């Protein structure tokens, strides 16, 4: 009896591509379709439709794979996704994948074996796992190649952060970027720099490779010991901004009089530190909710109006930005 594996070998495609063709579930290119049809005819293959139906029936499980749940932004994102999915009768498996590829692979294996209905993740792993046929929605770090995604308007956010400090009289700015392999961070960083150049404001770029508070503190110490006499800082996240505030206090400098600083995310604790952090707000909860709604529509074969959803951002004025001087 001819198997799917034999058809795949004959057609020169993967087993999962043959499975999608037979189940009529998921994308198969015209070229692959023709090869499979020829192979099926040549090998006289007859699929077991009842077994295929059982195999392709999806479990009501959604994987939620996030990079660092110690960062308050991501638990709020998870809350938005989980509340919607639970209401729809779905279970959520939360995976703290960090930046380790092995952890991601381990979670993916479990989700594949469980025949999960979908995945919500900050990392688009289609390039690493091209045969993965579980519907996936990317959140926060959405690239051009992502099929489905929910993200904030990072370009506007980066520009807005720069505009706020320039309007408040910035003369020399430290622009801090998070890890540049993250699309969202990269877009913000470029937009902030473009605005500073446009307004001819002096700046220097610094690169942070961590979201760990203690590591960021070390980086902040080096930046502020730079003897550049920065009067303003654009931080890539509220966590970064808080680490810089801690270091500015240690140096006995006043915020915002000596150094003003703007964060990004508007996590809950940003309003409780001293001084309260001025920041760019993006809704982590709404991002998770929109991603969950999108994965639910995909899993239940509903019409999808937009495959990529961009959420607005806005400035939240608190105490770390100088008041605009009156003329």
UniProtKB/Swiss-Prot annotation:
PROSITE patterns: HTH_LACI_2. The keyword Hydrolase does not apply. Gene3D superfamilies: 3.40.50.2300, lambda repressor-like DNA-binding domains. Residues 1-56 form the HTH lacI-type domain. Transmembrane segments: none annotated. This is Ribose operon repressor. It comes from Lactococcus lactis subsp. lactis (strain IL1403). Keywords: DNA-binding, Repressor, Transcription, Transcription regulation. It comes from the Bacteria. InterPro entries: HTH_LacI, LacI/GalR-like_sensor, Lambda_DNA-bd_dom_sf, Peripla_BP_I. The keyword Chaperone does not apply. GO terms for molecular function: DNA-binding transcription factor activity; transcription cis-regulatory region binding. It holds the Pfam family Peripla_BP_3.
């Amino acid at each position: 009896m001819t198997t799917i594996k034999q058809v795949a070998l004959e057609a020169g495609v993967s087993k999962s591509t043959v499975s999608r063709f037979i189940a009529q579930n998921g994308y198969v290119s015209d070229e692959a379709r023709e090869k499979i049809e020829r192979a099926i005819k040549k090998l006289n293959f007859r699929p077991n439709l009842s077994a295929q139906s059982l195999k392709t029936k999806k479990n009501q499980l959604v994987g939620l794979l996030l990079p660092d749940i110690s960062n308050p932004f991501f638990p709020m994102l998870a809350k938005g996704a989980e509340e919607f999915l639970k209401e729809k009768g779905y279970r959520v498996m939360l995976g703290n994948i960090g930046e380790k590829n092995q952890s991601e692979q381990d979670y993916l294996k479990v989700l594949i074996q469980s025949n999960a209905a979908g995945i919500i993740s900050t990392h688009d792993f289609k390039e690493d796992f091209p045969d993965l046929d579980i519907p996936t929605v990317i959140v926060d770090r959405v690239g051009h190649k992502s099929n489905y995604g929910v993200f904030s308007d990072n370009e506007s956010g980066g520009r807005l952060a720069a505009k706020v400090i320039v309007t408040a009289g910035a003369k020399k700015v430290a622009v801090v970027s998070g890890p540049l392999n993250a699309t969202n961070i990269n877009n913000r960083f470029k937009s902030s720099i473009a605005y500073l150049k446009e307004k001819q404001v002096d700046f220097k770029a610094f690169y942070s490779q961590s979201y760990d508070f203690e590591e960021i503190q070390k980086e902040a110490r080096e930046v502020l010991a730079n003897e550049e006499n920065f009067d303003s800082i654009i931080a890539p996240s509220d966590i970064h901004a808080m680490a810089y505030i801690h270091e500015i206090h240690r140096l006995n400098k006043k915020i915002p009089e000596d150094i003003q600083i703007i964060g990004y995310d508007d996590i809950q604790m940003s309003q409780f530190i001293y001084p309260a952090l001025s920041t760019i707000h993006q809704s982590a909860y709404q991002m998770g909710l929109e991603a969950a709604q999108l994965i639910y529509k995909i899993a239940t074969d509903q019409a999808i109006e937009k495959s990529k959803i961009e959420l607005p951002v806005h400035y939240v004025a608190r105490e770390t930005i100088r008041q605009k001087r009156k003329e």
